[in-house]
Amino acid sequence: MARETEVESSHDGPPKVTETSPSPSPSPPPPPLPPRQMISSDSPAQVAPAQAKPTTAVSSIDISTVSFPDGSRGTFSTSAPRVGFTPHTNASGYGTPGRDATGGDLADSMSVMSFAPTLRPHGDLASLVADGLNKKSRAWNMLRSQSETVQPFESIELGAPGSLAGFEREFDEIPDDKTDDIRMAIWKSKMKHYMILSSAGKPIYSRHGDLGLVNSYMGVVQTIISFYEGANNPLLGFTAGNARFVIAIEGPLYFVAISRLNESDAQLRSQLEALYMQILSTLTLPTLKSIFVHRPSTDLRKPLEGTESLLSSLADSFTRGSPSTLLGALECLKLRKSQRHAINNVFLKNRSEKLLYGLVVAGGKLVSVIRPRKHSLHPSDLQLIFNMLFESGGIKSGGGESWIPLCLPAFNNRGYLYMYVSFFDGNADPAFSAESTAEDTPESSTDTNTTNTTEKEDEIALILISPDKESFYDLKEMRDKLAAQLTKTGHLSLIRSAARERRPQIQTIAPGAQIAHFLYKSRANVQFCMSALEPANPNPTPGTSSTTPTTVATTATVASTSTSTLEPEKMLTRRRLMTLYHELHASMHAKHAHLKVLHAVSEDAASLAWITPVFEFYCVAGPNAPRAAMAQGANRVIQWAKREEERLFIIGGGVF
């Protein structure tokens, strides 16, 4: 069949030719093409550039964040319409890439951007592209200069809700005149408990509450431990609510620590080991074993009678926060190398033949030590001695000198050594009467309260240890010679003045550093040093500025002004600080962690940990302190510690 051809005429274009087939249902014609724009030869072509558009619309509202000097933050929305993308500044003060107001593109090189949103960005964004990311706004620079002065925990008030709410009442005794329900409620409110019981279930010691009050709970603990022991799967610890239970089994004794202070199992277990060492220092290991071999149900409270104060003072030091226990190291009194060497020489020249160890201690800090060439005292043994001398107060109240049989478990847990202790206080000792008279000037005696509060720091003790129980008079004679020689050379007054200086300030060590407190441990010497913490004054007195710093460390200024308010605040700040250090230490020393540097930021503080084979360093700063500034301050403190190493630490000591 022949096809038919139609020719149509159009006014807008050339004629169209259409072929038609004899199909019974012809398809509709396609739509006409749009008219083509005529290009004038007088003007160049205006072609819009191809611009990428977002594939997902998140929000059409701009959210701005502002940081206040007290560390708090606020957010608000801006309703101004946006024309394309505009450069803006995020909460950390750094500009983020975008298009300009004219809608132009960024440079071709700006193809990747990394931004990690956090609750508290601190401006540590790593730019992968152009340097425009690191540009700070002028308003942020002005605000940052004020916010960086915020001290750790400054925004937390005493009694504020939180994990440490009520900690200021932690060491209050449970009253005996209340009903059992009230006493039990007070006991349960304590944040830290230590229990010691025998494998037969006999209670031995409890830090809070008498044994009659907690006897039933000890029975429950003994049942749980015995159940797991019977299954040949000793129980190491468990969690109940927000409390962590850690159990240590030492022969016939069970040690239990219950903590709500966010401490790791390893840290709690080291504290329980220290309590066990305290018991061994009284009984020795063979005596302890023989007691329970013959009578497993023996009540150990009678052999340990009189040592409850030592256990309680040691436990309270753990609850308050003990850097020495956390780091497993000693703190020494800062002295010049020549001065310490001269004191060691006086020691060695007047040494008795029956002397094993000789120590001079001031305010709980080691000043000088002489020892045999191949023997040294373990820090845990020295911690027991310092706890006995300076924390419990039993020896100091007994008079000017004491003779004490003592087992040092890390040195030898199977026998006793004999310790001669004498305090140099100037009043009870005629050898120091001239010195005390010279020092009792009107300026030093105007404030008796200050003198009483600093008595612990001024206490200087001479400790002479011998394996011979008949060497009392020999060591007493050595003490008299040392007293006369140290007084004559002026070394005793030198030690006392050094003890009164207390710990160094950050601004003295590294002026301008943005860290508030640090711990530095020399791993080779097993010794540490620390600084004083200076937050803003929480309760400024009339006529003083609210930003005037006040020392939180143990100082006469703090202790003599409003002790009813500052003492709980100081104790709470110390606990918060030590909680941060416990968390850092646990993270750095976690099994299989292998961390070298750790930076952590919370709502109240920023912290940094750094561990090398030479040292361990931990520091705390305000919540707005940048990481780079903290690292710079840490470097300066570490360099200072290396320069002052022979003053801060005892290297070798006197050896005979």
From Swiss-Prot:
Annotated Basic and acidic residues bias: 1-14
Highest taxon in the source lineage: Eukaryota
GO cellular component: fungal-type vacuole membrane; Mon1-Ccz1 complex; multivesicular body membrane
Keywords from the UniProt entry: Autophagy, Endosome, Membrane, Protein transport, Transport, Vacuole
Coiled coil (UniProt feature): none
Region (Disordered): 1-105, 433-455
UniProt GO BP: autophagy; protein targeting to vacuole; vesicle-mediated transport
Localization per record: Endosome, Multivesicular body membrane; Prevacuolar compartment membrane; Vacuole membrane
Biased composition (Pro residues): 23-35
UniProt feature, compositional bias: Polar residues: 53-67
Bilayer topology annotation: Peripheral membrane protein
Regions of compositional bias (Low complexity) in chain numbering: 443-453
Similarity comment: family membership: Belongs to the MON1/SAND family.
Entry function: In complex with CCZ1, is required for multiple vacuole delivery pathways including the cytoplasm to vacuole transport (Cvt), autophagy, pexophagy and endocytosis. The MON1-CCZ1 complex acts at the fusion of vesicles with the vacuole, through its regulation of the SNARE complex during the coordinated priming and docking stages of fusion, and particularly at the stage of tethering/docking.
Protein name: Vacuolar fusion protein MON1
